[in-house]
UniProtKB/Swiss-Prot annotation:
Highest taxon of the lineage: Eukaryota
Family: Belongs to the UPF0357 family.
Keyword Signal: yes
Range of residues in the leader sequence: 1-25
UniProt keyword NADP, yes or no: no
Protein keywords: Signal
Protein name (record): UPF0357 protein YCL012C
Top-level taxonomy: Eukaryota, Fungi, Dikarya, Ascomycota, Saccharomycotina
UniProt-listed InterPro entries: DUF2015 (IPR018559)
Length: 133
């Protein structure tokens, strides 16, 4: 009788764990389906309307859910990231084996440091004066 109780308890714990895992991975799965949909559309010659720079970035993996370049960029005149930044971010992604968002964050923090800005956006210069709210 006690063994049956523990077996049921174990089954509920496993079921709850699977539900939590699925809820956590839901956004990743949605991103995978979106990428698969765009791949299928491109195979049937249904092009995604992007300007050329964004299309190259998409093919090279320089996008994420937070840096969405798929949605409504056909009339966007901006060129996206410059070539030097793209190459630096790709190197960071390959060397550190991290995703695009983390690589872009590391790149921006490095650029901030080169320009006298702390990673949180405050100036590093000790003579700088900032106003509190």
């Amino acid at each position: 009788m006690r063994g049956l109780f523990y077996l049921k308890l174990l089954a509920w714990v496993v079921l709850l764990s699977l539900c939590l895992l699925m809820a956590h991975r839901k956004t990743k799965v949605a991103d995978k389906f979106r990428a698969l949909r765009s791949r299928i559309q491109s195979r049937f010659n249904r092009r995604i309307r992007l300007n050329d720079s964004f299309a190259d970035d998409l093919e090279n993996g320089l996008h994420s859910r937070n840096f969405d370049i798929i949605s409504e960029n056909s009339n966007d005149a901006r060129g996206g990231l410059d070539d030097i930044s793209k190459n630096e971010i790709k190197k960071i992604m390959e060397n550190d084996n991290i995703d695009f968002d983390k690589a872009r964050l590391l790149y921006m923090e490095k650029k901030f440091g080169q320009n006298g800005i702390a990673p949180d956006g405050t100036p590093i210069d000790p003579k700088a004066f900032t106003f509190d709210k």
